[in-house]
Curated annotation (Swiss-Prot):
Family matches, as Gene3D superfamilies: 3.30.420.40, Actin, Chain A, domain 4
Protein name as annotated: Actin-related protein 3
Gene (name only): ARP3
Annotated organism of origin: Acanthamoeba castellanii
Role: Functions as ATP-binding component of the Arp2/3 complex which is involved in regulation of actin polymerization and together with an activating nucleation-promoting factor (NPF) mediates the formation of branched actin networks. Seems to contact the pointed end of the daughter actin filament.
Main localisation: cytoplasm
Keyword Nucleus part of the UniProt annotation: no
Molecular function terms from GO: actin binding; ATP binding
SUBUNIT field: Component of the Arp2/3 complex composed of ARP2, ARP3, ARPC1B/p41-ARC, ARPC2/p34-ARC, ARPC3/p21-ARC, ARPC4/p20-ARC and ARPC5/p16-ARC.
UniProt superkingdom: Eukaryota
Cysteines joined through disulfide linkages: none
Family annotation (CDD domains): ASKHA_NBD_Arp3-like
Length: 427
């Protein structure tokens, strides 16, 4: 704990949801949509051009305080304009981001920021300027005593140590982080992200929801117009799973429809009338876009297992075995039943085929050692990034690597361009 004796605050701002809470806890205290509802007043063009926090907005008027975040933002969508301050993992509107953090700290966590160190997360390849903007808001607006900005992939690796599959605490591995808006495949070696090998996949939870909705509409399922997206999302989260073979799965449904088809029961939010939605092939076709993306999009056609294999193959050769041996899942869109099992099988097939071909081409002169492929699933997978941050921020070393307010005052925001890796975490 800090000198005040209070735990650090951990906030993970995702594209779809923000997770926040105090270090040392196993789950975030609050999980809210990363959305803000404002009166739609035009943003100062100087802010928009520089994507900078507005220091001249320090003297707030009533309009500056008239906003809602999270679920309350959607509840007030008829009167207020909803915007997403984070898109594809990156902060797009720093004015709204500052307002969002303000409510997170004072309304939800109900803490005095001057008394708590803060751990915030960032996506891979985040621009150093973004760290400066974050530091400026945290140190100047909220006057926090200490700040650490952690890479989400490293935190996800740390969270995987809770899995029974993990026999060795290591910060070397491949993180597949799939949330609501974006999916990243991130190789990490000894706590450092191999930036040149990161792969981005334009498919994530929101795309699965839209695909499920598309399939329901094609079958003319009667869903209240105002609730179509929410119903598709609930069907995805309740009934979807990953199948081992899509052709065999179709046959199962056609042979035994009573066994495999499900029914979603809902109540209209306006008329309060009950309604039913039949759920069929959507159960396995939704998550299947990760493994056969051509069924959903003609723009991106590379299956996730192939992307993971290509990512690891592009890394330095001495790191590859460690990256194959520790493939860690993170994010809500990796929570589908048998997701890890299917992914491990497909990656293993690709690796074994390459070894077999190399032996054939060398006419048996080269004998390769088998590569161990292991995909790690664990019970903290959905909140892996936040939980990893909670673990690290509860260690004494966290306070040693934090950038302090005193250092910020002496050096300026550039001090937060670099955040040291926790060296003693794996001990």
């Amino acid at each position: 704990m800090s000198r005040s004796g209070l735990p650090a605050v951990v906030i993970d701002n995702g594209t779809g949801y923000t997770k926040m809470g105090y270090a040392g806890n196993t789950e975030p205290q609050y999980i809210i949509p990363t959305a803000i509802a404002t009166k739609g007043i035009a943003e100062d063009p100087r802010c928009r051009a520089r994507r900078w926090w507005c220091p001249w907005a320090a003297g707030k008027n009533i309009a500056d305080l008239d906003f809602f975040i999270g679920d309350e933002a959607y509840e007030n969508s008829k009167v207020y304009q909803i915007t997403m301050p984070v898109r594809h993992g990156q902060v797009e509107n720093w004015t709204h981001m500052e307002q969002f953090w303000e409510h997170c700290i004072f309304k939800y966590l109900r803490c005095e920021p001057e008394d708590h160190h803060f751990l915030l997360t960032e996506p891979p390849l985040n621009a150093p300027e973004n760290r400066e903007y974050t530091a400026e808001i945290m140190f100047e607006t909220f006057n926090v005593p200490g700040l650490y900005i952690a890479v989400q992939a490293v935190l996800a690796l740390a969270a995987s140590w809770t899995s029974k599959q993990v026999t060795e605490k290591t910060l070397t591995g491949t993180v597949i982080d799939s949330g609501d808006g974006v999916t990243h495949v991130i190789p990490v070696a000894e706590g450092y992200v191999i930036g040149s090998s990161i792969k981005h996949i334009p498919l994530a939870g929101r795309d699965i929801t839209n695909f499920v909705l598309q399939l329901l509409r094609e079958r003319n399922e009667k869903i209240p117009p105002a609730e179509t997206l929410e119903v598709a999302k609930r069907i995805k989260e309740t009934f979807s799973y990953v199948c081992p073979d899509i052709v065999k799965e179709f046959k199962k449904y056609d042979t035994e429809p009573d066994k495999w088809f499900k029914t979603y029961e809902g109540i209209e939010s306006v008329g309060k009338k009950p309604y039913n939605v039949d759920v069929g092939y959507e159960r396995f076709l939704g998550p299947e876009i990760f493994f056969n993306p051509e069924i959903f999009s003609s723009d991106f056609l590379t299956p996730l297992p192939k992307v993971v294999d290509e990512t690891i193959q592009s890394c330095p050769i001495d790191t590859r075995r460690g990256l194959y041996k520790n493939i860690v899942l993170s994010g809500g869109s990796t929570m589908f039943k048998d997701f890890g099992k299917r992914l491990q099988r497909d990656i293993k097939r690709a690796v074994d085929y390459r070894i077999k071909r190399s032996e054939e081409l060398s006419q048996g002169r080269i004998k390769s050692k088998a590569v161990d492929v292991k995909v790690i699933s664990h019970h903290m997978q959905r909140f892996a990034v936040w939980f990893g941050g909670s673990m690290l921020a509860s260690t004494p070393e966290f306070y040693k690597v934090c950038h302090t307010k005193q250092q910020y005052d002496e050096v300026g925001p550039s001090i937060c361009r670099h955040n040291p890796v926790f060296g003693a975490m794996t001990m």
